Amino acid sequence: MTIAVCPGSFDPVTNGHIDVITRCCRLFDEVHVVVAVNAMKKPLFTETERVDIIKHALADSGMTNYVVAWTDGLITDYCRKVDSPVIVKGLRQNGDYEAELGMALVNRHLAYVETMFLPANPVLEHISSSVVKDVARHGGDITGMVPDYVVPLLEKALR
């Protein structure tokens, strides 16, 4: 059984994230969606809230071969713990490749974990958590950028 790890800050989870996760679920026996706690970031939602939001967002995906968890440690340590040989990341055309390649090389060095890149769905490529928060913060419509469940949660968190 091949387990893949799909990490991110997911603050908030976007429809782009959900797309990558569901595609990943079609490719692997089991997918661990891991909320990675980054001490350098000030998230809107706690790690527990983000886990719950992702679980709710994936509930209607039709996928059942996923686990949602969080870690404040290295993703490679999490990979070792669950015996996963691969990390899967989505890539947009906005410079993600350079940043993600650097992390992929570090992860391979630390734990011999390979990183696979899935190109973003072109329809969702412009969406990022940062863009969603900025649009919502200024009263813009984020419908279609995030799962419907996330819209009121994000609006409340930004008040």
UniProtKB/Swiss-Prot annotation:
Keyword Transmembrane helix found: no
One Gene Ontology cellular component annotation? cytoplasm
What's its catalytic activity?
Answer: (R)-4'-phosphopantetheine + ATP + H(+) = 3'-dephospho-CoA + diphosphate
Q: How does it assemble?
A: Homohexamer.
Binding positions (substrate): S9, K41, I75, K89
Please name the top-level EC class of this enzyme. transferase
Q: What UniProt keywords are attached to this protein's entry?
A: ATP-binding, Coenzyme A biosynthesis, Cytoplasm, Magnesium, Nucleotide-binding, Nucleotidyltransferase, Transferase
Pfam families for this protein: CTP_transf_like
Q: Among the record's GO biological process terms, what is one?
A: coenzyme A biosynthetic process
- HAMAP family reported in the protein's UniProt record: PPAT_bact
SUPFAM superfamilies registered for this protein in UniProt: Nucleotidylyl transferase
Q: Which family does it belong to?
A: Belongs to the bacterial CoaD family.
Write one Gene Ontology MF term. Answer: pantetheine-phosphate adenylyltransferase activity
Pathway assignment reads:
Cofactor biosynthesis; coenzyme A biosynthesis; CoA from (R)-pantothenate: step 4/5
What InterPro entries has UniProt attached to this entry? Cyt_trans-like, PPAT, Rossmann-like_a/b/a_fold
Q: What is its EC number?
A: 2.7.7.3
NCBIfam families tied to this protein: coaD_prev_kdtB, cyt_tran_rel
Q: Where in the cell is it found?
A: Cytoplasm
Taxonomic source organism: Bifidobacterium animalis subsp. lactis (strain AD011)
Q: What is this protein called?
A: Phosphopantetheine adenylyltransferase
Looking at the UniProt record, the site noted as Transition state stabilizer sits at: H17
